[in-house]
Swiss-Prot record:
The active site is at D67, E126 (proton acceptor). It comes from Campylobacter jejuni subsp. doylei (strain ATCC BAA-1458 / RM4099 / 269.97). It catalyses: N-succinyl-(2S,6S)-2,6-diaminopimelate + H2O = (2S,6S)-2,6-diaminopimelate + succinate. The keyword Cell membrane does not apply. Zn(2+) 1 binds at H65, D96, E155. It comes from the Bacteria. GO terms for molecular function: acetylornithine deacetylase activity; metal ion binding; succinyl-diaminopimelate desuccinylase activity. Pathway: Amino-acid biosynthesis; L-lysine biosynthesis via DAP pathway; LL-2,6-diaminopimelate from (S)-tetrahydrodipicolinate (succinylase route): step 3/3. Its EC number is 3.5.1.18. Keywords: Amino-acid biosynthesis, Cobalt, Diaminopimelate biosynthesis, Hydrolase, Lysine biosynthesis, Metal-binding, Zinc. Binds 2 Zn(2+) or Co(2+) ions per subunit. GO terms for biological process: diaminopimelate biosynthetic process; L-arginine biosynthetic process; lysine biosynthetic process via diaminopimelate. This is Succinyl-diaminopimelate desuccinylase. The lineage of its organism: Bacteria, Pseudomonadati, Campylobacterota, Epsilonproteobacteria, Campylobacterales.
């Protein structure tokens, strides 16, 4: 089957995280000349497809996920019955990221590779906790001395048109929970209470929206963003016993969890508080002079006639795991205007160009 036919079939699998619904088997059969390893951990299914061309040379891998978020209500048609309409294909996962997976498969089938090894790493747990997916496969590969030198993840990176953006890194994510302790009491006797809201009010302006670093050419500043704040028992005559606040920092490599901890401790000095911090993902950056960045940039410009912005914008992705294992990684895919949305769709023209970009990358790597 051709690339579009394969994509349409792939979109029919109801592969809501963490269930692959048979999609991984379907892909393995399409690339039957690749060696297949089904790697399962804690009930999460993953697939490594790999093909050796020669003993010496570079190992190029492609990474992605077949799982999708739930469709929800309000779709114009069944989210798992792909509908082609006005040059678009509508279905859950059309942009995020089954179009990328299908483009990988098409390129791996048809491109002439001059390196040592090609691999495709797929998981059914990227939209969930993402602990036992790509990370588990890379761990498995490391133990067998099979880690790739370079990788491409086909997350939908483009904004307005195919070719306008390549991700060369990602910010990390630090989650924070702050508890300010007080003493509950009658509102008419504030002198007998310790009101944590009053105590924390001057501190809030030092926390909310604060930039922990000035940013750089590649990264925006690491900003503290308050996501939730609450205290009291929803009555007007009782002061709160405590104040709970949650925040997130999308951090660049210039700001660490320890930096966040030090700053919060400094501004909360004198308060009775508890602080909990967790790094849910780490920042990474692939140098713009690295081969994978240069070659991807060349292929994108050649096929799309666009000059892509090399950036680190957006949330986290499984590309961070490749970086953690020392693999030089970039991300490139279709536009992301309908990801996780009702009536998710992908432009057929964008998809066809994506197939050509990946094919060109393989052949000129």
């Amino acid at each position: 089957m051709n690339a579009k036919e394969f994509l349409i079939e792939l979109l029919k699998f109801k592969s809501v995280t963490p269930n692959d619904d048979g999609a991984l088997n379907f892909i393995a059969m399409e690339l039957s000349d690749f060696e297949a390893f089904f790697i399962e951990k804690e009930g999460i299914k993953n697939l490594l497809l790999t093909k050796k061309f020669k003993d010496e040379g570079e190992h190029l891998a492609f990474g992605g996920h077949v799982d999708v978020v739930p469709a929800g209500e309000g779709w114009s048609s069944d989210a798992f019955v792909p509908m082609e309409k006005e040059s678009f294909i509508y279905a859950r996962g059309a942009q995020d990221m089954k179009s990328g997976v299908a483009a990988f498969v098409d390129a791996l089938k048809n491109a002439d590779f001059k390196g040592a090894r090609l691999s495709l790493i797929l998981t059914s747990d990227e939209e969930g906790e993402a602990i036992y997916g790509t990370k588990a496969v890379l761990e498995w590969m490391q133990k067998r001395d099979m880690l790739p030198d370079y990788a491409v993840v086909a997350e939908p990176t483009c904004v307005k048109k195919i070719g306008d953006s390549i991700k060369i890194g990602r910010r990390g994510s630090i989650n924070g929970k702050l508890l300010i302790r007080g003493k509950q009491g009658h509102v008419a006797y504030p002198e007998k209470c310790i009101n944590p809201v009053h105590d924390f009010a001057p501190v809030l302006k030092l926390l909310a929206g604060f930039d922990l670093d000035p940013g750089s050419a590649e990264f925006s500043p690491s900003k503290i963003v308050v996501t939730d704040i609450r205290g009291g028992i929803e009555v007007c005559n009782v002061t709160p016993n405590d104040l709970k606040l949650m925040f997130n920092v999308r951090n660049s490599p210039d700001t660490s969890l320890e930096d966040v901890k030090s700053y919060v401790e400094k501004i909360c000095h004198g308060l009775n508080y508890e602080l909990e911090l967790k790094q849910s993902s780490e920042a990474f950056l692939t140098n713009i002079d690295n081969k994978i960045v240069q070659k991807m940039n060349e292929s994108v410009q050649k096929i799309t006639h666009e000059v892509p912005e090399l950036n680190t914008k957006g949330g986290t992705s499984d590309a961070r795991y490749f970086a953690k294992y020392g693999v030089k990684v970039v991300e490139f895919g279709v536009c992301n205007d309908r990801i996780h949305a009702i009536d998710e769709r992908v432009s057929i023209e964008e998809f066809e160009k994506l197939c050509l970009v990946f094919k060109d990358l393989i052949e000129n790597f």
